[in-house]
Every structure is written in structure tokens, then in C-alpha cells.
């Protein structure tokens, strides 16, 4: 019998901690015997969505591509861990509705000021200077999930505590074996 895959969909501002959490939880899932792949928004944009800009239409296309690959992995027994801003609720809900495996939305709820202070690439600074258009939290909106399965607050909890809570949730759903 094939292992059940599922999707962990991390969403939040740039600098919220999505990639950090994805990279922290993936080895824990692998240690539990779960085949696990990370779909990082920056890497997907570079490899599958090259040529797309940051208009709403292009962002929606990028997120749909991530959702398609995540669903493909999950329905083949892989845990797909996604880390992408995915700022628009309607597209996240669309991905959830198309998922053929359990979809766990994880809202990385970080105050914009903190996310901005963590910005190693200087993207917020460039956006505030008008050098980057359509930047979430500056010139474009972020629509928080209305009913995420899990909310983590990286301003209040350490990464290990967040990962522990996520793993506890997955255990409670019978997804970690």
C-alpha cells in the first residue's frame, strides 16, 4: 500500500519564516520515514516560472504551478512542503479545492515590521524606494487565511516550537504514521 502524501502550505509575508520552517520540518518528516520535497517559492520561480513577473496574474500563475506540482507529489505519496508568499486567498483556496490529498495551510503570522527587519536581500527597502513594483506588504496586499489549519507566530515562538506544534497537528490527523 502506498504511503499517503499531503501538502503543507506555508503562507505569509516575505521574511515571515516560511522557508526557514519548511527547511526545519522537512528533515523531521524524513526521519519519520516520509518522502518529503520542498517547493520553495524562490526556487520554483527561478526554474518553473522563469519569465513571469509580479503582476497579480503572474503571481496567480506561479502559485497555480506550485499547487499543481505539490498535488502531483502528494497524490504519489510524497509530502509536499511549500514555502511561497501566495498572497491571494482565492488562489490558495483554489489550490486547496483541487488537492487530491490532505492540504494543511500554515499561516506564518509575522508582523510586517518584523518580516521587513529580517529582510536579508533588501527587498522591502527596494520596494519602499519604488524600485520593486507589486511587492506584498508594501504596494500589494497580503490576504491572511481565514481558517488555516495551523497558525504559527514566529515573533513569539522559536522555530523548534513551531515545528513541534506542526508535527503534533500532523500526528493528531494520523499523517505521520
Which sequence ranges carry the predicted segments?
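The conserved Walker
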Residues: 14
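Conserved beta-strand scaffold positions in the cores of enzyme catalytic domains, especially
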Residues: 38, 103-105, 149-151
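ATP-dependent NMP and nucleoside kinases share a basic, alpha-helical "lid"
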Residues: 47-53, 70-127, 134
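Hydrophobic anchor at the beta1->P-loop junction of P-loop NTPases
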Residues: 10
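Small-molecule kinase domains that catalyze NTP-dependent phosphoryl transfer to phosphate-bearing small molecules
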Residues: 109-112, 117-165, 173-177
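Phosphate-binding P-loop
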Residues: 1-5
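Conserved substrate/cofactor phosphate-moiety recognition/catalytic segment
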Residues: 23-68
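Conserved lysine of the Walker
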Residues: 18
Amino acid at each position: 500500500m502506498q504511503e499517503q502524501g499531503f501538502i503543507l502550505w506555508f503562507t505569509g509575508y516575505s521574511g515571515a519564516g516560511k522557508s526557514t520552517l519548511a527547511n526545519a520540518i522537512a528533515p523531521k518528516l524524513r526521519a519519520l520515514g516520509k518522502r518529503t520535497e520542498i517547493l520553495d517559492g524562490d526556487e520554483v520561480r527561478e526554474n518553473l516560472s522563469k519569465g513571469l513577473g509580479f503582476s497579480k496574474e503572474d503571481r496567480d500563475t506561479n502559485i497555480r504551478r506550485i499547487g499543481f506540482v505539490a498535488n502531483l507529489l502528494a497524490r504519489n505519496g510524497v509530502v509536499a512542503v511549500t514555502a511561497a508568499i501566495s498572497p491571494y486567498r482565492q488562489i490558495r483556496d483554489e489550490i486547496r479545492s483541487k488537492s487530491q490529498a490532505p492540504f494543511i495551510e500554515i499561516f506564518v503570522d509575522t508582523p510586517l515590521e518584523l518580516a521587513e527587519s529580517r529582510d536579508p536581500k533588501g527587498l522591502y527597502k527596494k520596494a519602499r524606494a519604488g524600485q520593486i513594483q507589486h511587492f506584498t506588504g508594501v504596494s500589494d496586499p497580503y490576504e491572511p487565511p481565514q481558517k488555516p489549519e495551523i497558525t504559527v507566530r514566529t515573533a513569539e515562538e522559536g522555530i523548534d516550537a513551531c515545528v513541534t506544534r506542526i508535527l503534533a497537528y500532523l500526528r493528531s490527523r494520523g499523517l505521520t504514521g
